[in-house]
Swiss-Prot record:
GO annotation terms (biological process): purine nucleoside catabolic process
Tissue: Expressed in roots, leaves, flowers and siliques.
Residues the record marks as active site: 82
Reaction equation(s) it catalyzes: guanosine + H2O + H(+) = xanthosine + NH4(+)
Source organism per UniProt: Arabidopsis thaliana (Mouse-ear cress)
Organism lineage: Eukaryota, Viridiplantae, Streptophyta, Embryophyta, Tracheophyta
Positions of Zn(2+) binding: 80, 110, 113
Record-given protein name: Guanosine deaminase
Family the UniProt entry places it in: Belongs to the cytidine and deoxycytidylate deaminase family.
PROSITE patterns assigned: CYT_DCMP_DEAMINASES_1, CYT_DCMP_DEAMINASES_2
GN (gene name): GSDA
Length: 185
């Protein structure tokens, strides 16, 4: 496997961060964990589990979860590498809030995975390839395009309708009726 990297004079490696157009210096440990995520991506394809995506979650410089895309293996369109790693890390650490952890992804996360990263409160994301690399080999970006308002939501015949009347009222009451019983964090 040939690595693509840009090395600075101080030995750091530059990769894209989660913010478009922003470059961040990545130190040796970051490179090590990002390399592990890339290895997971290869592993997932080699064993037929799913697409070429890998993710590693780290706590105090120790790997908590190292996963790859499992969409085909589990017949689950949500079993992306990042989501699978978050699920595994939450189970291992016995909590749903991963604010002391970092995630390394082989590719820029899709909107669903960004959502999972946000909801799990991961403190840092380092990714290698831009989404365009995945798009170039046939993975689509229609959800991101739809969210940005730059594309037409053609790939789905999904009808979206907000309920009204009694259906909406009873659904909204769930939150009022359970606010004292349920605390997320």
């Amino acid at each position: 496997m040939e690595e693509a990297k840009v090395e600075a004079k101080d030995g750091t490696i530059s990769v894209a961060s989660a913010f478009s157009g922003h470059q961040q210096a990545v130190h040796d440990s970051d490179h090590k964990f990002l390399t592990q995520a890339v290895e997971e991506a290869y592993k997932g394809v080699d064993c037929g589990d799913g697409g070429p995506f890998g993710a590693v979650i780290v706590h105090n410089n120790e790997v908590v979860a190292s996963c790859h895309n499992m969409v085909l293996k589990y017949t689950d369109p949500t079993a992306h590498a990042e989501v699978t790693a978050i699920r595994e890390a939450c189970k291992k650490l016995n909590k749903i809030e991963l604010s002391e952890c970092e995630i390394y992804a082989s590719c820029e996360p899709c909107p669903m995975c960004f959502g999972a990263i946000h909801l799990s409160r991961l403190k840092r994301l380092v990714y290698g390839a831009k989404a365009e690399a995945a798009i170039a080999i046939g993975f689509d970006d229609f959800i991101a395009d739809a969210l940005r308002g730059t594309g037409v939501y053609q790939k789905s015949s999904l009808e979206i309708k907000k309920a009204d009347g009694n259906g909406a009222a009873i659904a909204e009451q769930v939150f009022q009726n359970t606010k004292e019983k349920f605390r997320l964090y």
